[in-house]
């Protein structure tokens, strides 16, 4: 709503020279200063600090997902409905109803989701924190959250802010006559801003120059993984691209940005038409707002954008638009007005481009937000896109005559908007969860648990299959490492490694993968055991690790949780899953084409999306290298004379001062390790490998595993980290990351 090239998140340095002549402006730590002021190109390992208990104020043992199931949802709805029409003098309700404000709040919380990396969304309550709480597109949503405080205060630990922020918009629409598709609770609160989300390189609000750099005017060339056309907007500039009031050009931005939120044309049109059935925008005067919440004075107590105007004089986006004559009621009047008039451009009182009916059409048909006055309807440039763009126009013209279809599509799109980042349906809680499922939910049929005897039989069959340690471990890793904690998609459950698009990913080495799949399917069919392919893949990886450990002198059993299910190709959205394809996999020394950042940065981002800590990332790298798990069977980074054995050789040789490293003569980003005395070539390695010897923090971890008394610890820690990755998506048994 309007009030509103790959790049992993790396901190930006402050490079303006100080008056003293120092080339950096260094601040005390309490003001945000850090080592990164001096060394801005260092990898950001803070992304891998996984200890939420340190900042979580809840008591030990508190589980929000248990607490929310004791919530009286019916009473919450009654309390919310009463709050919606209880206008407060400090922030009066437009049209006597806070519902439209809450819809915008929910939309803007969920609408930050982007499909490329799964980040954003409402699932962690990030709208409460910087930078989102201070984005220019979120003006006045601080008031919306403050209005909800009585409900949050009353229900306490049973209701998270994360759930309440999106529930509010959902219930508001029901209160105003719309039948939603349902609602799922289950979003726990986080207690600090996410520092791992890249929102763009611009250093000013509403800037766009960096995200379209090199695009030569092609608005579809928005930098990945960004989902908005301007810094600080949820989607697009409602006045049109760069303020140009061209509805056709605006449609290009709309299609690109909504598509990056995983919405197709029908869903996009439904969200805009349905959402703009309610409420208004605010630009009643040319008053300039005060600073945003993060920059506001202490006495404003977390609120921002202060100005003398409230109620009818409120200024948020600077656009002054009321779309319909029934702004607190669900109906088809948005489309009736959009198609029932020809439109002319004019300026809002705040100077923003917007549209009104020609020839004073529909004058005095739209209520004022406060009082009893009347005015004319108005539209945004992006609203006119819903009529003038050929694709959107065909969709919305049909809805003009078939409003029941609009209602159905809006209900589905709204539910998707609010729940896209929640992961599998096993995470949906509460009495309002719909029984219907949709393709975008990545449904996995329930699997069957295996007995210990079944597991033993299958492990024997896998061990006798002729598949190598490298084939077994690599296939399990490829399947499980598709998981990302950001939106809890991917992983081994579902067995989609054998389906398109994963079967054809370059990173998955399709020809080699097909051979392994064929052999595992043969075992699945001949074993006489009702086992899923997904379970076999993970079990195969475990067999490979146990075999490699035994060869190194360690008799271990890798923990295994059975019960994974197998999805079908028909249950798999090929386009949606294509976004999970790794551009690089540092754990296997794979680097794809077209990356504009070095592989070590990609590794940190990948480890973060796998929900790994720095020690877990480190031990996994060392173990996989020792096993010879590399893309294309490369020897790059295999710093051992016994590949296929689970030893700590990788760390021993990486930290050996008898090995001298230098860039490879081919200047291809790889390195050659030679004997410091003889000059004999001993190993080759990648930038990822040398990171663990050059970065001071990672070297400290590597040294732990290189020590003579750490061989047992290395094996134990590797197995534990491996199991974490294999089970990262097991929300069906309460083990998910």
From Swiss-Prot:
Catalyses which reaction(s): H2O2 + AH2 = A + 2 H2O; 2 H2O2 = O2 + 2 H2O
Placement of covalent cross-link Tryptophyl-tyrosyl-methioninium (Trp-Tyr) (with M-261): 107-235
UniProt keyword list: Heme, Hydrogen peroxide, Iron, Metal-binding, Oxidoreductase, Peroxidase
Cofactor(s) the protein requires to work: heme b
Organism ancestry: Bacteria, Bacillati, Actinomycetota, Actinomycetes, Mycobacteriales
Example of a GO MF term: catalase activity
Name of this protein: Catalase-peroxidase 2
Underlying gene: katG2
Stretch list, region Disordered: 1-33
HAMAP family per record: Catal_peroxid
InterPro entries: Catalase_peroxidase, Haem_peroxidase, Haem_peroxidase_sf, Peroxidases_AS, Peroxidases_heam-ligand_BS
Active-site residues, as the UniProt record annotates them: 108
């Amino acid at each position: 709503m309007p009030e509103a090239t790959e790049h992993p998140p790396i901190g930006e340095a402050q490079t303006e020279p100080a008056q003293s002549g120092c080339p950096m402006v260094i601040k005390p730590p309490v003001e945000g200063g850090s080592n990164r002021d001096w060394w801005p190109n260092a990898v950001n390992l803070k992304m891998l600090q996984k200890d939420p208990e340190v900042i979580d104020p809840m008591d030990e043992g508190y589980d929000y997902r248990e607490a929310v199931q004791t919530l009286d949802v019916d009473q919450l709805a009654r309390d919310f409905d009463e709050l919606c029409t209880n206008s407060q003098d400090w922030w009066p309700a437009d049209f006597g109803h806070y519902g439209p404000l809450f819809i915008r709040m929910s939309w803007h919380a969920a609408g930050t989701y982007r499909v490329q990396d799964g980040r954003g969304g409402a699932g962690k309550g990030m709208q409460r924190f910087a930078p989102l709480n201070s984005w220019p597109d979120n003006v006045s949503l601080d008031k919306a959250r403050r209005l909800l405080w009585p409900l949050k205060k009353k229900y306490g630990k049973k209701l998270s802010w994360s759930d309440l922020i999106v529930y509010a918009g959902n219930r508001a629409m029901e209160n105003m006559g719309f039948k939603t598709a349902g609602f799922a609770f289950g979003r726990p609160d986080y207690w600090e801003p996410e520092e791992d989300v890249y929102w763009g390189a611009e250093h000013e609000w509403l800037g766009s120059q960096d995200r379209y750099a090199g695009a030569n005017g092609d608005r579809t060339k928005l930098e990945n993984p960004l989902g908005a056309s301007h810094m600080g907007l949820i989607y697009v500039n409602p006045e049109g691209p760069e303020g140009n009031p061209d509805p056709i050009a605006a449609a290009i931005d709309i299609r690109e940005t909504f598509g990056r939120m995983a919405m197709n044309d029908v869903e996009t049109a439904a969200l805009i038409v349905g959402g703009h059935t309610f409420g208004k925008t605010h630009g009643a005067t040319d008053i300039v707002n005060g600073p945003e919440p993060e920059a506001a004075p202490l006495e404003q107590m977390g609120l921002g954008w202060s100005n003398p105007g409230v109620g009818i004089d409120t200024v948020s986006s600077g656009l002054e638009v009321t779309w319909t004559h029934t702004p607190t009621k669900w109906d088809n009047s948005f489309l009736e007005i959009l198609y029932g008039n020809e439109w002319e451009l004019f300026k809002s009182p705040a100077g923003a481009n917007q549209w009104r009916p020609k020839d004073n059409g529909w004058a005095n048909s739209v209520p004022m937000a406060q009082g009893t006055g009347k005015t004319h309807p108005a539209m945004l440039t992006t609203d006119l896109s819903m009529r003038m763009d050929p694709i959107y126009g065909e969709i919305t013209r049909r809805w003009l005559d078939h409003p029941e279809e609009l209602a159905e599509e809006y209900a589905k799109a709204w539910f998707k908007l609010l729940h896209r980042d929640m992961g599998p349906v096993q995470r949906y809680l509460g009495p309002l969860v719909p029984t219907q499922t949709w393709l975008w939910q990545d449904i996995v049929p329930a699997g069957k648990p295996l007995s210990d005897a079944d597991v033993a039989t299958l492990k024997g069959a896998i061990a006798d299959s002729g598949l190598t340690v490298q084939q077994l471990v690599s296939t399990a890793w490829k399947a499980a490492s598709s998981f990302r904690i950001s939106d809890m998609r991917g992983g081994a459950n579902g067995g989609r490694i054998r389906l398109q698009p994963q079967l054809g990913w370059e990173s998955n080495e399709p020809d080699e993968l097909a051979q392994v799949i064929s052999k595992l399917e043969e075992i699945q069919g001949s074993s006489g055991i009702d086992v899923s392919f997904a379970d076999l893949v993970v079990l195969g990886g475990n067999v490979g690790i146990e075999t490699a450990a035994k060869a190194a002198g360690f008799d271990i059993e890798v923990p295994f949780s059975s019960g994974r299910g197998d999805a079908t190709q028909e249950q798999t959205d090929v386009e949606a899953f294509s976004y999970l394809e790794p551009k690089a996999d540092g754990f296997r020394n794979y680097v794809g084409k077209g990356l504009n950042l070095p592989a070590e940065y990609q590794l940190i981002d990948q480890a973060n999306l796998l929900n790994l800590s720095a020690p877990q990332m480190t031990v996994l790298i060392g173990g996989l290298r020792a096993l010879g798990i590399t893309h294309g069977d490369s020897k790059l980074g295999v710093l051992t004379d016994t590949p296929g054995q689970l030893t700590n050789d990788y760390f021993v040789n990486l930290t050996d001062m008898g090995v001298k490293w230098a860039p490879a003569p081919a200047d291809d980003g790889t390195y050659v390790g030679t004997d410091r005395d003889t000059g004999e070539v001993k190993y080759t390695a990648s930038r990822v490998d040398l990171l663990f010897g050059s970065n001071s923090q990672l070297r400290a971890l590597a040294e732990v595993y290189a020590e003579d008394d750490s061989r047992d610890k290395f094996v134990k820690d590797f197995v534990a980290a491996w199991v974490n990755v294999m089970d990262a998506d097991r929300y069906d048994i309460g083990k998910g990351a």
